[in-house]
Regions:
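Compact, glycine/acidic-enriched structural inserts
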Residues: 83-120, 126-127
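Domain-length cofactor-binding catalytic modules of enzymes
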Residues: 2-33, 42-47, 57-61, 71-73, ...
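Active-site cofactor/substrate anionic-group-binding motifs, chiefly glycine-
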Residues: 55-85
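Short loop segments at secondary-structure junctions
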Residues: 68-69, 90-92, 327
């Protein structure tokens, strides 16, 4: 293991943790979370920590958790199926207008963003009347949704079709980017919205109730699990796979609407948008075969990186992003980071940085510069360069992107 590109953390109890964190900080809180996960009796071989690893609600963001015989709903969390989509267009930088505000405005009119009215009837982040093609997509998702509700009526969420094709809040974004050759890309980041949140929250509590009922002691109550062979396990896996499909459809609809809106804006010449398409989940569960065994792999803030797999690793607002190709490294369970990773909490970022700091950090990017997005300022994140250097054995860079427009909720 002398030539290994990762550090090995060996807990007193449990499996090892292989951490691709050389040259990037690993906070104590995240390390402790990883040590708790490593103690679970159903972890397969080891836990893998990506270079963007940081403390998260429920489980560590940037972790890959392979399991046999059980699943931890909080390890997936509430933004089930969160992920990325990027499309290279036939446009180049010289064909964009000098003032990009009109492009940003066209995107913000085509995609509902943010959350207001506590998610109520006047929420600007949901469609008041879903477009017809969104209704058609929902029709394909609805039968499985109704089957889930038949068993768990409490999972019903009022914003179903009206959240399809919407961005959300937090670190979700839409960007117009330029690659190393000056080609224009559209890139976005979002998940399963309110429906997925309802699913995640419900099953996390269900698992905790099961632990109390069975009097099972855990190093962290958030690591409550559902044993394979139980109805709750099967029902959760079904629900989470449905939410992942919903999240993918959400991103696809947003991208379609963005392409149409920019194309109809009159600000750019006619273009095509099928040059290269990359799409990946980074908050999800999948059955996979590793070291000859079929296991459930939970990637919480990590991207599958089998040999040849294309993935997206975004930086922060004002930092580079990367289109990558997986190397299929078995030590990481064929995974890589999902971004730069937070260097501090949102609360800490708001205390530490000012609007002026944020304006300077996002110079040259058409984006929000107000106090409400300071928690997403580039300084709140780790260095994407250091993160990429730490995972050179996991992925190779295919394209380097820099954003020129960024839309946040």
């Amino acid at each position: 293991m002398a030539d290994a590109k990762f550090n090995v953390i060996t807990p007193e109890n449990g499996v090892p943790i292989k951490a691709w964190t050389r040259g990037v900080p690993l906070e104590d809180a995240a390390r402790n979370q990883l040590l708790n996960v490593a103690q679970l009796p159903f972890i397969y071989k080891w836990v893998a920590a990506m270079p963007d690893v940081h403390w998260g609600i429920g489980a560590t963001v940037g972790s890959v958790i392979p399991t046999r015989g059980a699943i931890v709903p909080a390890a997936v969390g509430v933004d089930i199926g969160c992920g990325m989509m990027a499309i290279q267009t036939s446009l180049n930088a010289s064909q964009l207008p000098d003032n990009l505000h009109g492009i940003r405005d066209a995107i913000e009119k085509a995609v509902p963003v943010g959350r207001t009215d506590q998610g109520g009837a006047n929420d600007r982040g949901a469609w008041k009347h879903a477009p017809e093609h969104h209704v058609d997509v929902w029709a394909g998702l609805e039968p499985r949704y109704k089957a889930i509700l038949a068993k768990y009526p409490k999972l019903e969420h009022k914003q179903r079709v009206n959240h399809l094709g919407t961005l959300g809040t937090g670190n979700h974004f839409i960007e117009v980017c330029l690659d190393e050759a000056g080609r224009v890309w559209f890139m976005l980041h979002s998940g399963s919205r309110g429906v997925g949140n309802r699913f995640g929250t419900f099953f996390i509590e269900l698992a905790k109730n099961d632990m109390r009922k069975w009097m099972i002691n855990l190093p962290d109550a958030d690591l409550a699990y559902l044993p394979q062979g139980t109805d709750h396990f099967d029902d959760y896996v079904d629900a989470v796979h449905w939410a992942q499909d919903y999240a993918l459809a959400n991103r696809q609809l947003m991208m379609q609407n963005i392409i149409r809106a920019v194309g109809e804006s009159g600000l750019v010449p006619a273009f095509t948008s099928d040059v290269e398409v990359v799409s990946c989940h980074h908050n999800y569960v999948a059955w996979e075969n590793h070291y000859g065994e079929n296991v459930l792999v939970t990637r919480k803030g990590a991207v599958r990186a089998r040999e040849g797999d294309m993935g997206i690793i975004p930086g922060s607002m004002g930092a580079r992003s990367y289109i990558v190709r997986g190397k299929g490294n078995p030590e990481s369970f064929m995974s890589c980071s999902h971004g730069a990773g937070r260097a501090m909490s949102r609360t800490e970022a708001k205390k530490r940085f000012s609007v002026d700091d944020h304006v300077k950090a996002t110079a040259g990017v058409e984006c929000r510069k107000d106090a409400d997005v300071i928690d997403e300022t580039p300084m709140a994140y780790k260095s994407i360069d250091a993160v990429m250097e730490a995972q050179k054995d996991l992925v190779e860079v295919v394209h380097t992107l820099r954003q020129v427009v960024c839309v946040k909720g």
